[in-house]
Swiss-Prot record:
Family indicated by similarity: Belongs to the peptidase S51 family.
Protein name: Cyanophycinase
Single annotated GO MF: serine-type peptidase activity
EC number(s) given by UniProt: 3.4.15.6
Classification via NCBIfam families: cyanophycinase
PANTHER family cross-referenced by the UniProt entry: CYANOPHYCINASE
Pfam families: Peptidase_S51 (PF03575)
EC class (word): hydrolase
Keyword vocabulary terms for this entry: Hydrolase, Protease, Serine protease
Length: 298
């Protein structure tokens, strides 16, 4: 069955009916926040406040993992100050730089007890190299799946969310195989391939290139100071100042990706594209889109 898609040109009665449907998906307490980088850390801090609230607000015990960064103490300290100012009950840094540290009973105990984990930006390959296939990652994965933990990742911390991960590449070019470097991510949301700093760095071409190589995955491009909040019921909702771009290959009919040279242009037929902004929703499994309630006239 083809997925249902909201056509914004629908008649008003249809839009009003969708308005009621929009109110149906209820946010569960915990969530996974995938942030496109450069989130507001000074003024309204909406995205960081949303993470703080989902992690327990004044009762939050937040653990910051700055393993992607070359300056983990500095970047971790910045987030500690932010969440302490918001009123978190406890905030700590787990400065994990080597895989052996993931065996530490103290580290594992912290992750079993905390209510929120924040993965900072930096280098996604460094982050995966430290955390993948470790007890630390297993604790995070199981607690997220069980609805016991709110997880956020920004920039590199967002890139690692899928099983197939964009490790690097170019920007602003015609889609081709050499435009994107792929690696294995942490698989927290295995159905997606995430790119970050998306429109800010002109990365549409490389996300399409990644999806052409893995047409069983959903491409998600997230702008700076923008967040895709993944709920446990399959819905994602957009927060922040930019947009979230969905590249959906569900109905893809043809790509030449397996047969062309690395620098030759790609052919990709029948991709579906959604551009979502504040309040819009998308269902990860049903491939359904719903507009923000505030955009529907009463």
């Amino acid at each position: 069955m083809a997925p249902k898609v909201v056509d914004r040109r629908n008649t008003m009665p249809q839009l009003q009916a969708k308005s009621l449907e929009m109110r149906t998906p209820q946010a569960t307490k915990t969530a996974v926040l995938v942030i496109g980088g450069a989130e507001d850390k000074v003024h309204g801090r909406e995205i960081l406040r949303t993470f703080f609230g989902r992690a327990g607000a004044s009762k939050a015990y937040i653990t910051i993992i700055p393993s992607a960064s070359r300056e983990p103490a500095i970047i971790g300290g910045r987030y500690i100050r932010i969440f302490e100012e918001m009123g978190a009950e406890k905030v700590e840094i787990l400065d994990i730089r080597e895989r052996e540290q993931c065996e530490s009973s103290q580290v594992k105990a912290s992750l079993e007890a905390c209510s929120g984990v924040f993965l900072t930006g930096g280098d996604q390959l460094r982050l995966c190299g430290v955390l993948s296939d470790t007890p630390v990652m297993e604790i995070i994965r199981q607690r997220v799946r069980g609805g016991q933990l709110t997880l956020a990742g920004t920039s590199a911390g967002a890139a690692v969310m899928g099983h197939h991960m964009i490790a690097g590449g170019g920007s602003g070019e015609t889609p081709n195989r050499s435009l994107v470097d792929m690696a294995t991510g942490l698989g927290l949301i295995p159905e997606v391939i995430v790119d970050q700093h998306f429109h800010n760095r002109n990365r549409m071409g490389r996300l399409i290139s990644a999806v052409a190589a893995h047409p069983d995955r959903l491409g998600i491009g997230i702008d700076e100071d923008t967040c895709a909040v993944f709920e446990r019921d399959g819905w994602l909702q957009v927060l922040g100042k930019g947009s979230v771009t969905i590249v959906d290959p569900t109905e893809l009919t043809h790509t030449n990706e397996p047969h062309v040279g690395a620098n030759e242009p790609l052919t990709v037929h029948n991709l579906r594209l959604h551009i979502l902004s504040y309040g819009d929703r998308f269902h990860l499994y049903q491939r359904t889109v719903l507009p923000a309630v505030h955009r529907i006239s009463s």
